Amino acid sequence: MNRTHLYAALLALSCGAALSAAANPASVASGPGPWRSLLQDHSAPDWRGWKEPGLPAGWHVAGGVLSKDGPVDDLVTNESFGNFELELEWKIGRAGNSGIFYRGTREYDHIYWSAPEYQLLDDANAADGSSRLTAAAAAYALYGAPAGVVLPFDQWNKTRLVVKSTHVEHWLNGRKVVGYELKSADWKSRVAASKFAEYPNYGLATAGLIGLQGDHPGALAIRNIRIRELP
């Protein structure tokens, strides 16, 4: 093929590809969105209390660390999220108990009646540490996480949470510790055998609030919390 014919062929191919993409925008692959911080150095504008606007009494932000010591109102995001990847670092006090809720709604009086929970716990000293179903990184009361992955109290742990369509992954300190499918037969049977059975829309929302549990005793600190939306 001579050079003129080669240029003409390449031009035709590129024009055809552009026209195809324009006619079928859904065919163009879209990746994850950009990472976005959910915490500033001295404020938490992306969060509010479950019961009240703004940051409830007992929660504090300093040096990019969100913390509480003792029972306080739960926190929820101002914005709802459907498919996302969430990363954060957390440390908990001795016998501390907290959690990260996802796809929560305001249908019920507490977020935990609608939202699955990634458990944050001092496994060695909190009562919930006696069962893997309620230990650190478990999908609370539904899917257990293995022992020996969480670090002791007052040490920083790294969490990654992936929620896409019905697929959920819990990661702890670089290790995938829980994976499950929302609305699957297995998931439904576990919910039916749990305390969440009384709440028919538990875990069914396709998008909702992210929450941080504050109503249990003990100290909790969160830093480097960021999120990106997934296609």
Residue ranges and their predicted role:
Residues 21-231:
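Carbohydrate-interacting regions of secretory-pathway proteins
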Residues 8-18:
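Bacterial N-terminal signal peptides
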Residues 1-9:
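Bacterial N-terminal signal peptides that target proteins for export
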